[in-house]
C-alpha cells in the first residue's frame, strides 16, 4: 500500500473541493436552502429621496452632530448624581447599618441578656455572656459582634423584645484592620449613645410595621 505524501494529499483535497459534494448537488442550490429567509437582510431603497438622505447622512455627518447635540443638552440639566461624600442621599427608616446597643433615658442598659439575638443570628456573629445582678435581673457581661461575619439581615433587631440591639443609620465604618471590626459591648453602647436620636426617630417612623 502506497503512502500519500503531503503535496499529493493537498492536491486531492483541492480537486474534491472543486468537484463539490457527492452527487454533484451544492447545499446552497438545494431545495432546503431555497426555503431560507433572511430576516434581517434589507435591500436599500433606491428612490431619489432615500438616496439623497443616505448621502446627506454620510457627507454631512448628521448622525454625529445629532449625538453631540444630545450630549450637550445634558450639560444644562439637573445632575442625576450627588457629590459623595460631601453630599449624601436620604436613608430609609428601615436602613440596616452599623450595630448599636441602646439605653433607657435613665441611662440603664436595655439589654436583658435573653440571648434571642444570639440564637437567631444566621451567621453566628453574636456572642453573649451574662450573669444575674443583686436585684435578680440579668445583664450582659460580654456582648461581642463580629462584623466580618454579619450579613445585616436585621434578625437580631427584630428578635429583641426591648429594642436593645439595633442597626443604626451609619454606613461609613470602614477600617484598616480586622480587629477594628470586632465590636465589644463598650463599642456598641457608644454607638447607641451617638445615634440615639436617629435610631429613636427611625423606630417611631416604622412603628406601624413592627
From Swiss-Prot:
EC class: translocase
Role noted for this protein: Core subunit of the mitochondrial membrane respiratory chain NADH dehydrogenase (Complex I) which catalyzes electron transfer from NADH through the respiratory chain, using ubiquinone as an electron acceptor. Essential for the catalytic activity and assembly of complex I.
Name used for this protein in its record: NADH dehydrogenase [ubiquinone] iron-sulfur protein 8, mitochondrial
Cofactor notes: Binds 2 [4Fe-4S] cluster.
Keywords noted in UniProt: 4Fe-4S, Electron transport, Iron, Iron-sulfur, Membrane, Metal-binding, Mitochondrion, Mitochondrion inner membrane, NAD, Oxidoreductase, Repeat, Respiratory chain, Transit peptide, Translocase, Transport, Ubiquinone
Pfam families to which the protein is assigned, alphabetical: Fer4_7
4Fe-4S ferredoxin-type domain: residues covered: 102-131, 141-170
Top-level division of the source organism's lineage: Eukaryota
Membrane topology recorded in Swiss-Prot or TrEMBL: Peripheral membrane protein
Reactions this protein catalyses: a ubiquinone + NADH + 5 H(+)(in) = a ubiquinol + NAD(+) + 4 H(+)(out)
Gene label: NDUFS8
Residues that bind [4Fe-4S] cluster 1: 111, 114, 117, 160
The keyword Transcription regulation belongs to this UniProt entry's keyword annotation: no
Cofactor or coenzyme needed: [4Fe-4S] cluster
SUPFAM superfamilies in the record: 4Fe-4S ferredoxins (SSF54862)
One Gene Ontology cellular component: mitochondrion
Record-listed E.C. numbers: 7.1.1.2
Residue sites binding [4Fe-4S] cluster 2 per the record: 121, 150, 153, 156
